[in-house]
Amino acid sequence: MRGLVFLVAACILAGTVGCGGTRGEAPKAYRRGESGPNPMPEEAPWKEADITLPPYPRDQDLILFEPRGQTTNRFYVDGSSLTVDPDRVIRFSLVIRSAEGARTVSYSGVNCKTAGWKDYAFGPDGDRWERVADPQWREIRDQQMNNHQYTLASEFFCYGGIFSGGPTGDAKSIVRHLKHPPTPDARVPARYN
């Protein structure tokens, strides 16, 4: 019986020693693009999708949200314009109303993976879009005043907060979340679909 236990233990030990690779070496970890028995495929470079400007925002489609920080402005997302595009950028119309009644309208995008914000167009005359000549991605930062970009990205758009790599869900679920936000203590959204 003792011999049988010893034989089983020896077989188990021999099996685990041989698992590492050739002659007890650890298995090689392959990086993206390297060749090997199970190489990781090359990741395609990110390409931004072509955009089509949505219809100009209508008051009945606006969803009020409250940004963190100090502001006297009111901030709205046009729920009918919000999309999650194949390039994983969330695009939407934003309306900002000042306490004095001035209105700023923009068509913007948020890239959760890079924590980037881009304005594609503005509505300077109140009923039509004017494209930005050379729109550029800018970093989203947590600020004290008019913190709408950070609030949208970290609390509504990006799963696990910004730099997360992905949107929280499809356009309908994000709009639903904007209409029914979590309690003020729930700052980082879960994935919701």
Predicted regions and their residues:
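Bacterial N-terminal signal peptides that target proteins for export
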Residues: M1-L7
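C-terminal motif of bacterial Sec signal peptides marking the signal peptidase cleavage site
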Residues: G15-G18
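N-terminal secretory-pathway/extracellular module detecting exported/lumenal segments
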Residues: G20-N193
